[in-house]
């Protein structure tokens, strides 16, 4: 594994703080499906689709270059989104729900 891939994996593992099981369970909720940017025709949001891909990545051992590219996308998106934290209670916020679709629960230690 190259240094770049090791760094990507370490950053991904640091920012994705939900297990595959937790994320899969979350993605089945109405709250998960209620947030995120959807295409004109509706359907699944970008974040929800990413969450399903994250579950796959968390469960596999042999990662492809496409997997590493998605891991970098997850890290970048999550860092940007964390900077937009709203004021007040975030427990039931769309901001938190969106982050959880990307595998990061800001309420987890």
Placement of each model-derived feature along the sequence:
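A charge-rich, low-complexity, intrinsically flexible signal that marks solvent-exposed coils, linkers
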Residues: 2-109
């Amino acid at each position: 594994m190259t240094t770049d891939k090791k760094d990507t994996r370490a950053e991904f593992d640091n920012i994705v703080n939900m297990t595959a099981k937790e994320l899969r369970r979350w993605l089945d909720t109405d709250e998960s499906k209620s947030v995120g940017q959807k295409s004109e025709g509706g359907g699944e949001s970008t974040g929800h689709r990413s969450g399903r891909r994250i579950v796959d990545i968390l469960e596999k051992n042999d990662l492809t270059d496409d997997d590493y590219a998605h891991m970098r996308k997850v890290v970048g998106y999550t860092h940007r989104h964390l900077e937009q934290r709203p004021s007040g209670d975030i427990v039931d916020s769309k901001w938190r729900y969106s982050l959880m679709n990307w595998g990061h629960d800001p309420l987890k230690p």
